[in-house]
Amino acid sequence: MREGSDWIEAGIALLQKVRDTQSGAIERASEICAEAIGAGGFVHLFGTGHSRIPVEEMFPRYGSYPGFHPIVELSMTFHTQVVGANGQRQAMFIERTPGLAEVILSNFQFQPKDAVMVFSASGLGAVVVEFARGARRRGLPVIAVTSIAQSRAGEMEGGARLMDEADVVIDLCTPAGDALCRLEGLPETPVGPGSTLAAVAVADAIKVRTAELLLATSKLPPVITSVAEVGRQRSDELFEAAYREHARRAARSLAT
């Protein structure tokens, strides 16, 4: 019994492909992020469905720092209920709704020094496509983290694909159906999606490289750090400093 080793091997191969083919795009994205954060701005992060996971991976958590601004709408990301109130059917319907992205964007006052990063494996839903389009219309550079194979295989709902509305495209390198493993006796339905693994890896790669670039210019904000690394007092100091810095930037970003 291989106990899931097939998926682990497929996941390793996927990460190697991302590393080997997307390093240039990751570097360009990191430069955009460093420029925005170093100037005192925000990199606004957006994703629907399971793409909220890489958004939350960026900030706030251990090893992260202010400058990344997560924007997550619970109506499109609350998946654990599955059926009934707040169920999956509603979430999938909402993320296809034209015009909603502009309503979300209207809550924020974007600065010229800001940037936007949108995560979506398919890159096809109306909300993510229109969110990226609206950000570009506001003059902001847009980074798309998406699967080119999935995007090309699917049906456009927002009049375009996310990758068509971005200045930098990072390919998750996942197959058209996302899942990585085909099991004997189950020819139609592959199992074990890979997009979350790849998206989180891309998120952390950008986070680390952006930190390096900011450190080189002495503009890296406080890094949230575990008690296990620096002790309780220092950990608390770093948490508070990071939250205060995030609050300072966020106060300028809310539309009034």
Task: State what each model feature region is.
Residues 230-256:
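Acidic, Ser/Thr-rich low-complexity intrinsically disordered segments
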Residues 1-4, 23, 30, 196-203:
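Amphipathic, non-membrane alpha-helical segments in soluble helical-bundle scaffolds
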Residues 21-38, 104:
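A short, well-structured juxtamembrane/interface segment
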Residues 1-21:
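Generic N-terminal amphipathic, Lys/Arg-enriched alpha-helix
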Residues 178-181, 187, 201, 212-238:
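Internal, active-site/partner-interface "lid" segment
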Residues 21-29, 43, 215-224:
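Flexible, glycine/charged-enriched surface loops at secondary-structure junctions
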Residues 38, 45-207:
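Glycine-rich phosphate-binding loops that contact phosphosugars or nucleotide phosphates
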